């Protein structure tokens, strides 16, 4: 088990995971790691446009996971071993990824937004037409964690993301969370909806 403060974020596309992670990096000294980093590196070999094409990355991730299920987990694990200080993993999308994050004592956070807000943010962020946005929302990774109940925290991803990042950082720092009591709390919340609010 790794002995460092790790925050692991999950949520649908455009819920603010990357923005909140960036605030944690800039304002609170976290180191950012993403499961998708390895995908971007692979996609970049096909050309720089592919590394930023979210639909292409989602499909590449699906294909890669079907052939080498723990490839992205191993890539994150290797990066974690090289980092010192607090870490934010910004993109949990699959059950194996949340299980990995929980196994290393990460504080898991599910960001939630209404689907209408997600559609609006996708159109604004990516300039996607409605059809393209629906393809992104329909990707396998978009709903893989919908039924997970044992998040440490569930947070509505609305409002000022800088304030949400501060609440996450402050809530975790002030709660004096240790890896042992995270595991205990997870055992005690398995039967509930899961997750506290910060």
Q: Model-derived features: where do they sit?
A:
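ATP-dependent small-molecule kinase phosphotransfer cores
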Residues: 31-87, 93-96
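Hydrophobic positions on the alpha1 helix immediately C-terminal to the Walker A/P-loop
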Residues: 20
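P-loop (Walker A) phosphate-binding loop of NTP-binding proteins
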Residues: 12
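Hydrophobic anchor at the beta1->P-loop junction of P-loop NTPases
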Residues: 9
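ATP-dependent NMP and nucleoside kinases share a basic, alpha-helical "lid"
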Residues: 77-125
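Walker A (P-loop) ATP-phosphate-binding motif of ABC ATPase nucleotide-binding domains
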Residues: 6
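Conserved lysine of the Walker
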Residues: 17
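Small-molecule kinase domains that catalyze NTP-dependent phosphoryl transfer to phosphate-bearing small molecules
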Residues: 71, 102, 111-176, 181-194
